[in-house]
């Protein structure tokens, strides 16, 4: 059977890729090992968080689905870092895991141009030169032809789980791993490796003594992840906080020899910023305790997730150290924690549009690329789906820059630097994070989604109204001046005769203070928050914009794909090797490759500025 596009895998990357392709009118097939586990939240029951929440809103602004699914399935909402600056604040929501999964599958099933099929892909169909994708072959012998394939295998490609001495060829507990494609990829010359991740035990709610824990409530004001949603009024469940203690650490230390992490059996690197409890005990010996969050997994389940206690120790040891924690003395484990090791492709093998350098038409996204997390996977899946569609249309790739989005930072880091450990997004990875606030995701990206055809007229019109209203209120602030009769408190006295716009720049004055004086400035909370942040941080934002403009000049110097850098005289040996391997798309990407010197960038610029080298510069220095 023939399709325009095939997506391998039904996780968060696969969902976004399949929806993007089908919504852009391409006949798409998603093949996954189990249709009942589409969109499964394999580890923590939450979406969003620092930088991750920003990415979810960026996905939504571009026309992706993750924001709408979490808005539908959330059971608690919080803004993290609320006491800090807006650049590092981020929305996070606990999810009802089953509700999230069900909604994801339902969305796929109801999508036009999209078919779902349960099977395991074991090989590719390729052209005679073995450098162009033509389709896939499944375990049961089915052959499906297509001109593009998006590969999103998650933790299932040669996945292996570890619980003490127990080993099983699985990508998740009780779910078999996938074999076949690993051999195909190796035979095609892909640089591959092993990575490791893990998950904690789940326990029964009835066995927890919540009186010994700290309760953590959600925020009363819920900010929807999707810009298409208005106010959300949701019932919320509480989370709880407890801590490990000296006895917990002793139990783990005494049994460290039983951990496959420290016996040498696991060769893959684990996530640096989401370590197992064994790692924490070894690496942070000076800490007397570690914080543990007890999180509900949904409205209709009694299972609780122990955030911060990921472990692959034997089940009896897990039971022992969990019972040493206050509030969990009688905790009953329903599912043990475990580690999972899996194959990944070094993302340096990919162009910035997430297409393979070795096989035309093969796009790769998610944990297969060495990333970690639902949000990182969904972001890559969306971009891979969009670029696969553009490949089918013979159009230029759509590549987001580092200055435009966290998604741009994520993909640029992966394809430029590669990775030897699961890559997780943080606000600190973005050089211009004040310009990447979660509330401005639509301002930055929705026009791109609209032009692509993923954002409909209704959503785009709603955004244009919001944009217009924000500017109208800013103009009103500039026109309105403070008179002496308006002053009701001492804070405002020094601002008499100034316009409201400049008064609002005072850190001690809020927009609410000014609305009390002039109620005509009032509007929805979303619009007022954006106005206030734009005005208060205008100076910083403008300085960043000036810097971004200069940096974007380097982005405008496009470099050819599949270029032989050995012919350029004056490049260092290291630069020749790294440019040949990475094949940077722009001079800016070339400058970010580790180990590259400014002199190498100058040599490149001079070489490609020469008209005889057939590279057109899109700006004047």
Swiss-Prot record:
Annotated localization: Cytoplasm
Record-listed NAD(+) binding positions: 270-284
Predominant subcellular localization, coarse grouping: cytoplasm
Cofactor: FAD
SMART domains to which the protein is assigned, alphabetical: GIDA_assoc_3
Gene Ontology BP term (one): tRNA methylation
Keyword ATP-binding: no
Binding site for FAD: 9-14
Assigned keywords, A-Z: Cytoplasm, FAD, Flavoprotein, NAD, tRNA processing
GO MF: flavin adenine dinucleotide binding
InterPro entries: FAD/NAD-bd_sf, GIDA_C_N, MnmG, MnmG-rel, MnmG-rel_CS, MnmG_C, MnmG_C_subdom, MnmG_C_subdom_sf
Keyword tRNA processing: yes
A GO CC term attached to the entry: cytosol
Database matches in SUPFAM superfamilies: FAD/NAD(P)-binding domain
Family membership: Belongs to the MnmG family.
Assembly and oligomerization: Homodimer. Heterotetramer of two MnmE and two MnmG subunits.
Role according to the record: NAD-binding protein involved in the addition of a carboxymethylaminomethyl (cmnm) group at the wobble position (U34) of certain tRNAs, forming tRNA-cmnm(5)s(2)U34.
Protein name per UniProt: tRNA uridine 5-carboxymethylaminomethyl modification enzyme MnmG
Originating species: Borrelia garinii subsp. bavariensis (strain ATCC BAA-2496 / DSM 23469 / PBi) (Borreliella bavariensis)
């Amino acid at each position: 059977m023939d399709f325009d596009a095939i997506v391998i895998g039904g996780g968060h990357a696969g969902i976004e890729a399949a929806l993007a392709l089908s919504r852009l009118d391409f006949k798409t097939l998603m093949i996954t090992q189990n249709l009942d586990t589409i969109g499964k939240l394999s580890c923590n029951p939450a979406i969003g968080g620092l930088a991750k929440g920003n990415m979810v809103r960026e996905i939504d602004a571009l026309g992706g689905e993750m924001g709408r699914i979490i808005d539908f399935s959330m059971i608690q909402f919080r803004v993290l870092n609320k006491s800090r600056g807006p650049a590092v604040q981020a929305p996070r929501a606990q999810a009802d895991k089953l509700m999230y999964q069900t909604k994801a599958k339902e969305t796929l099933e109801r999508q036009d141009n999209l078919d779902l099929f349960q099977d395991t892909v074991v090989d590719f169909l390729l052209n005679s030169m073995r450098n162009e994708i033509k389709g896939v072959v499944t375990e049961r012998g089915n052959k499906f032809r297509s001109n593009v394939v998006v590969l999103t295998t998650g933790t299932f490609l040669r996945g292996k789980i570890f619980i003490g001495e127990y080993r099983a060829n699985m990508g998740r507990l009780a779910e078999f791993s996938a074999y076949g494609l690993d051999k195909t990829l190796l035979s095609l010359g892909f640089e591959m490796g092993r990575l490791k991740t893990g998950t904690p035990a789940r326990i029964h709610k009835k066995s927890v003594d919540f009186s010994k824990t700290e309760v953590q409530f959600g925020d009363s004001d819920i900010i929807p992840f999707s810009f298409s949603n208005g106010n959300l009024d949701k019932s919320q469940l509480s989370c709880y906080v407890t801590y490990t203690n000296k006895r917990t650490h002793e139990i783990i230390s005494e049994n460290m020899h039983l951990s496959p992490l420290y016996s040498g059996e696991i060769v893959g690197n684990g996530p640096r910023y989401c370590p197992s409890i064994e790692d924490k005990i070894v690496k942070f010996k000076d800490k007397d305790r570690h914080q543990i969050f007890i999180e509900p997994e949904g409205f209709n389940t009694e299972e609780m997730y122990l955030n911060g206690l990921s472990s692959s120790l034997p089940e009896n040891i897990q039971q022992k150290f969990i019972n040493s924690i206050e509030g969990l003395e009688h905790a009953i484990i329903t599912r043990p924690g475990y580690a999972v090791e899996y194959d990944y492709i070094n993302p340096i093998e990919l162009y910035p549009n997430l297409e393979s350098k070795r096989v035309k038409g093969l796009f790769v996204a998610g944990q297969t690329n060495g990333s970690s997390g639902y949000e990182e996977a969904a972001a890559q899946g969306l971009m891979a789906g969009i670029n696969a569609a553009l490949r089918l249309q013979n159009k230029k790739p759509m590549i987001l820059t580092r200055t435009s989005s966290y998604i741009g930072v994520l993909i640029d880091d992966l394809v430029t630097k590669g990775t030897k450990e699961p890559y997780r997004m943080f606000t600190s990875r973005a050089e211009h994070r004040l310009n990447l606030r979660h509330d401005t995701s639509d301002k930055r990206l929705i026009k791109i989604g609209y032009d692509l055809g993923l954002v409909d007229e209704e959503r785009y019109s709603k955004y244009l109204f919001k944009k217009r209203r924000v500017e109208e209120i800013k103009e009103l602030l500039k026109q309105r001046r403070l008179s002496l009769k308006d002053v009701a408190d001492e804070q405002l006295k020094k601002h008499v005769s100034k316009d409201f716009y400049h008064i609002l720049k005072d850190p001690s004055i809020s927009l609410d203070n000014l609305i009390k004086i002039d109620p005509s400035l009032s509007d929805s909370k979303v619009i007022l928050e954006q106005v206030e942040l734009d005005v208060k941080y205008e100076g910083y934002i403008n300085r960043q914009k000036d810097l971004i403009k200069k940096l974007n000049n380097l982005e405008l110097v496009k470099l050819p794909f599949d270029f032989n850098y050995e012919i350029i005289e004056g490049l260092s040996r290291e630069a020749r090797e790294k440019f040949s391997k990475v094949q940077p798309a722009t001079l800016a990407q070339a400058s970010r490759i580790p180990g590259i010197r400014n002199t190498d960038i100058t040599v490149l610029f001079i070489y490609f500025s020469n008209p005889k080298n057939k590279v057109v510069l899109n700006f004047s220095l």
